Amino acid sequence: MVQEYDVIVIGAGHAGIEAGLASARRGAKTLMLTINLDNIAFMPCNPSVGGPAKGIVVREIDALGGQMAKAIDKTHIQMRMLNTGKGPAVRALRAQADKVLYQQEMKRVIEDEDNLDIMQGMVDELIIEDNEVKGVRTNIGTEYRAQAVVITTGTFLRGEIILGNMKYSSGPNHQLPSITLADNLRELGFEVVRFKTGTPPRVNAKTIDYSKTEIQPGDDVGRAFSFETTEYILDQLPCWLTYTNDRTHKVIDDNLHLSAMYSGMIKGTGPRYCPSIEDKFVRFNDKPRHQLFLEPEGRNTNEVYVQGLSTSLPEHVQRQMLETIPGLEKADMMRAGYAIEYDAIVPTQLWPTLETKMIKNLYTAGQINGTSGYEEAAGQGIMAGINAAGKVLGTGEKILSRSDAYIGVLIDDLVTKGTNEPYRLLTSRAEYRLLLRHDNADLRLTDVGYELGMISEERYARFNEKRQQIQDEIQRLTDIRIKPNEHTQSVIEANGGSRLKDGILAIDLLRRPEMTYNTILEILEESHQLPEAVEEQVEIQTKYEGYINKSLQQVEKVKRMEEKKIPEDLDYSKVDSLATEAREKLAEVKPLNIAQASRISGVNPADISILLVYLEQGKLQRVKN
């Protein structure tokens, strides 16, 4: 008997987990298929979550009702807030994960989730009828039927591991690759590219001389990604910093001909922002040294990840490199680094919902879409799961805009501009980064999560209480006038401010660069009555109000352009005067509105003006008819 589901998710990595959970939490009967149940939520590369932009994505996933933030909060070995000396727009959390505990926690959550079944099996083929996906077929011939399918295959599609002059078929960390499904996608007509990524060697902690390295401790205050976390892990493990040197670089130079990167064995394009050590040596040969972070992979293992030493050089050369690095001269290598090539689809073949344009109800998320990183994968996964379930159940799909979330920036970049290399999310990619902060992800997206059925009533009530507290406190400070008495003047001067000449509203005093919310309380001789997160919002919203308002005005302009819809079936060959490149790009991407069209590479303002005139003429013609 064929088993039937609403949604099937292929893969149980970081994208697959969020897709499966989101689909199930929206009420869809969901099946998650994975090659190996023991490798759910596996971290084949770095043992960390978060970082600039990426850490904000994790917070956004949490605000939408996803799981990554909660899992890392329970299983990390270290957590740090980055860029604390800079403005709030670029601050972000980064956590070192206990890889095994993280897997165990995610597996527990998935197994306990209502509406979600998990099955070990390798999908070989999509079942397509009348250009619409209807299910999947495994390598042993088992069929599972569904109204929607989400593909989250990571680097498994025709995966090949490369080490020196060796190349063999494999998924990450020597798991089984997915070859037949990769062939199936090509046969269906998808445009496929070949990408490459890599991983560094792991060394034995017992054989590291830490006295030659610099300690990198975590923060000594409680940190969390999830807005719901109330218990913090303060017993943290440090990381350590060391560097390459001239001797390391000589080993690389002497053996560069053995690197798969430079021997021609690797054809795939690698990630620009995470280059291999041999790539760093070639591209930045003026640098006398490169940073290497020694990151423990967990509390109950001696494996240490050598961040920054990603390589495809032969194993014996990797050992030679390690022998030149301070602290690692006698380190035992437990696993060799390697490069991996894999198939990815060209992401301009997707709608902003992550549904494929070619086959209805088929969604893709994660590295199959050309991205790098666990967080980018999870962000796509939750949206693909939300939209697959919403379409099947008739409860609606959701597209996050570039002003809503970094997830919106990520997906819009992929489906509008495409990518010719593994895509990494950066703060510089977001034009509204002052709006898309680490601290306000819940204020931006909890309403969305609640409307989608992903947020519980209890959580939503707590969120609304927080939001009201912020509004009330800003209003209270707006109503209080501070007099320039001796107490006030002394507090202001002690905090580096200039004396008041006249009375001033508390809210206006808080706007001064040197003033903090704590300073205002000290002047008012009040104790802390509100949660720290509320106080933080009051201060940030007040200090950056002018800049925030300017960003919001820009957002309104873009929203007006987004309201100018473009018919999905518009024949661009009939739009006179469009530049040839613009016509080709518009036909390929099929933008949903003028705002998206304006972001397509090769479409210039003149093309947009022509398109606007054409659409207006079409409206007038329909009115006359």
From Swiss-Prot:
**Tell me, what is one Gene Ontology molecular-function annotation carried by this entry?**
flavin adenine dinucleotide binding
Entry keywords, A to Z: Cytoplasm, FAD, Flavoprotein, NAD, tRNA processing
Q: Where in the cell is it found?
A: Cytoplasm
Look up keyword Flavoprotein and say if it applies.
Answer: yes
Q: Which domain of life does the UniProt lineage start with?
A: Bacteria
| Gene Ontology BP terms | tRNA methylation; tRNA wobble uridine modification
List GO terms (cellular component aspect): cytosol
Q: Where does FAD bind?
A: 11-16, 123, 178, 367
Which residues take part in binding NAD(+)? Answer: 270-284
Instruction: List, alphabetically, the InterPro entries matched.
Output: FAD/NAD-bd_sf, GIDA_C_N, MnmG, MnmG-rel, MnmG-rel_CS, MnmG_C, MnmG_C_subdom, MnmG_C_subdom_sf
**Cofactors named for this entry:** FAD
Query: Which Cys-Cys disulphide bridges does the record give?
Result: none
Cite the NCBIfam families for this sequence: mnmG_gidA
| Known function | NAD-binding protein involved in the addition of a carboxymethylaminomethyl (cmnm) group at the wobble position (U34) of certain tRNAs, forming tRNA-cmnm(5)s(2)U34.
Q: How does it assemble?
A: Homodimer. Heterotetramer of two MnmE and two MnmG subunits.
Q: Which family does it belong to?
A: Belongs to the MnmG family.
Output this protein's name: tRNA uridine 5-carboxymethylaminomethyl modification enzyme MnmG
